[in-house]
Amino acid sequence: MIKLKHNIEVTPKIGCSNVCEYCPQSTLIKRYKERIGSDKDTMMTLETFKKCLSTLPKHVGLNFTGYVEPFLNPETPDMLLYAYEQGYSILLNTTLMGLKKSDWMKIKDINFRELHIHLASGSF
């Protein structure tokens, strides 16, 4: 397992329907609404992701594990592929909820630094 000195969490969407026991969704959503407003979009676009990535050095690892199921944002597979093609090291933490077969075909050859698949505790 590769340990990077610098990592940044990528949260491609605010709000998650998995309701995992360890995840503070209510706190996250409350803070988001306080700071950003409730009328703002909760999905990160691929274009916004690319803009953010253009300011980030390549030695910084990307962790797609920021209090959301990443695949609830339909652009996440394209974000993952773009980041990988740009040379970033990627950690993905997912329940696979929202992932379609066509999405899997896009990302199946990505050499993830770490790939964690877990069950959503709220789904039992």
What are these regions (language model features)?
Residues 93, 123-124:
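Short acidic, glycine/proline-enriched helix-loop-strand junctions
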